[in-house]
Amino acid sequence: MRSRHSPSNRHRFRLFASLAPALAGFALLLFGSAAGAVDPDSVFHIDRNKNRNQVHYGVHLDQDCRPAGPEPVYNYWLRREEEPPVVRPLTYFQQTAYGFQKQKIENDGRIEVRLRALPDRQLVVRVAAVGGACKAETFMTIDGKQAYLDKVFVFAEEGYFVPAVRYIELYGRSNDGVAVYEKINVGD
């Protein structure tokens, strides 16, 4: 029997939701955000079928909303399976699946990124100052259309040594706000 003072799952979720911006800010400090930088929240994330944990991707920016450092896009775990949810860095082994193949900053400030999880797809992170705040968005081709990337879903089955990815789903929206979706079959 639950006491009247014990929090329900709904209250825990509300508490977490209210703390999420602070946790994201803590993650930026923890993972080496440059002093004085103005890093926006996660620009997209990867969900998986294994559990509710997510891999998030953010971008380090300077005070003028320009990419900070030679490899400004970074990743981290949002461990939603833990109580309360926590932010953690990816391990070396996890970076081999969810890390970066390359990052390149173009003269106009765009950041071209290739992920190990999507090696055949180029992602472009664009950053702008909007209303005094830095705003970053990720673009890529989804179902043959240039679109904003919202999230990636990876479905994998347990293998002998490592999970075997069966398919990847891309979720985004076109410039006019219409939802776009693509499923990429990977496994047999």
Spans of model-derived segments:
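N-terminal export/targeting and maturation segments
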Residues: 35-91
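Mature extracytoplasmic domains of secretory-pathway proteins
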Residues: 77-147
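Beta-sandwich interaction modules
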Residues: 145-159
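Bacterial N-terminal signal peptides
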Residues: 18-31
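N-terminal secretory signal peptides that target proteins for export/translocation
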Residues: 1-17
